[in-house]
Each structure stands twice: as C-alpha cells, then as structure tokens.
A protein has these predicted regions:
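A Lys-centered signature of the CheY-like receiver
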Residues: 42, 50, 93
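Conserved post-Walker A coupling segment in P-loop NTPases
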Residues: 52, 89, 103-168, 179-195
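The feature encodes the CheY-like receiver
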Residues: 4, 28, 32, 194-195
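Flexible nucleotide-interacting loop at or near the entrance of a catalytic core
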Residues: 56-119
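Short amphipathic alpha-helix used as the core "switch/output" element in two-component signaling
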Residues: 2-4, 9-21, 38
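Conserved AAA+/SF3 P-loop NTPase catalytic/coupling segment centered on the Walker-B
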Residues: 152-157, 178-207, 224, 228, ...
Length: 255
C-alpha cells in the first residue's frame, strides 16, 4: 500500500471517515509487525504481506464481504426497529394519550430515569421501547425484566449477577441485567413487586452507577438508563410503607 503524498495510515483514516463500516484489506510488501498492528488499530480488516500463498487473499475478501453484509443487515434491522417504535406508530388519539406521547418524546432526548404508570395492557413497554429507540442510547442494548415474574430470591441475582459459588447451583459467574444493558437501557417492568432490599440496591446503582455481583467484592461500573413501569400507584405504596420513598423519588424524576 503506497499512496502518493500520504502515509498509509492517513489513507486508512480517510477511508474510515468516509465509510466506517467499509472493510479494508491492506496488501503490502512490508512485513513489519509494528506496521501491521498500527494498520489494524486504524481499522484495517486484514493485513496481507506479499508474496502471499494460495487463496489467502480470496479468503480474506470473502470474509470481508460477509462482514460488510452483516453490518448492512444490522443497520437495516435497527432502522426497522427505530421506525416500528416511532412515537407516531403508537395508536391513541385521546388527550391523555397524546400528553403521554409528548412527554415521552421530550424525555427520550434526555438521559433521565423514567417511571411509566398505567393499567395492564396500556402499552407501557411499547412506550419504554419508543423512548429507547428515539434516544441517544438507541445504538446500545435494550434489556427488559418483569419483576413480578421472578421469585424474590431470583430477582436480585438476575438483576445484579453473581460470582461462581455465590449460592448453591452457582457453578459459574454470570452477568446480571444491569451489566447486560451497559451502554443502553434497562426496562424494569412491574417494579412495585420488587422487595425493599433490592430497591435499596437499585437506588445505590442509580446514584453511584456501579454494582457488586452477589458473592463478589469487585465493583463493576455500569452506564445504563433505567425505565421503570408499574400498574400500581407507587405513591400509595409509599404511603402504606410498601415501597421505599427514597427509591420512588429517585425513579420518578420526570416530568
């Protein structure tokens, strides 16, 4: 790879600036390991030194084309998801629904924790997905968990993960939903069913952006947005002592 008036690494940078997903195969007579490493760091898909034997180049080209095809397919599917979960696709024309959609549209442009309250079957998860796919985190994962669907003993380990040997049957370490949602959004459905101990741990995570897996002592940093939902009036739950007041006010920050 020889480019007049421009170094090969600068040339690679220019290509990646024009199309970050375009796979680039560098074919060169330079067998320097340092140059190969630098080229890969700048985004080269493969680095082939001349003279090469057999089908090494054609194999690299086939792999590059497959990667390009997957990247294009992923981009298409993501656009389909974003289009499907556009706020305009949520059915409803009552003043209350329109007000909710306007608020959801506003909050999607922020990174605030969100609490969605509504009866069963009113589309709370659909609103949560629309918020995610219209936010700056849409390129990250959207992970969901129904707090009412798991026993209390399992919910904590499912959310925060655990280390090997943390409890009977924990024969390997496992990431929790918070870690899996890192860089994206975690949707906590039916949060009213979460016990006070787990609520306290969620509160700490929201404030410190870190967690410890069950049975572990290592602190894990997480960057995750939390969207909560419930078909119960959490304000009433707080008054009755059935939900932690500090956790409620930390998740109910918008509007």
């Amino acid at each position: 790879l020889r480019v007049p008036k421009m170094g090969r690494l600068e040339f690679l940078k220019r290509i990646k600036t024009m199309d970050s997903e375009l796979p680039v195969i560098v074919v060169t007579g330079d067998d320097s390991i340092e140059t190969a490493v630098e080229s890969m760091k700048e985004g080269a898909f493969d680095y082939i030194v001349r003279p090469f034997e057999g089908e090494s180049l054609s194999v690299a080209v086939v792999k590059a084309l497959k990667m390009r095809s997957l990247a294009m397919e992923n981009r298409y599917l993501r656009k389909e998801l974003e289009s499907h979960y556009n706020f305009g696709n949520i059915i409803g024309n009552s003043p209350k629904i329109l007000e909710v959609l306007l608020l959801a549209g506003d909050v999607s442009r922020t990174d605030s924790t969100v609490f969605v309250y509504g009866e069963s079957g009113t589309g709370k998860e659909l609103v949560a997905r629309a918020i995610h796919f219209n936010s700056l985190r849409k390129g990250g994962p959207l992970v969901s968990i129904n707090c009412a669907a798991l026993p209390e003993t399992l919910l904590e380990s499912e959310l925060f993960g655990y280390e090997k040997g943390a409890f009977t049957g924990a024969d390997r370490s496992k990431k929790g939903r918070f870690e899996l949602a890192n860089g994206g959004t975690l949707f906590l459905d039916e949060i009213s069913e979460m016990n006070p101990i787990v609520q306290a741990k969620v509160l700490r995570l929201i404030e410190a952006r870190e967690l410890e897996r069950l049975g572990g002592s290592e602190t894990v940093k997480v960057d995750v947005r939390i969207i909560c939902a419930s078909n119960k009036n959490l304000e009433d739950y707080v008054k009755k002592g059935q939900f932690r007041e500090d956790t409620y006010y930390r998740i109910n920050v918008f509007p």
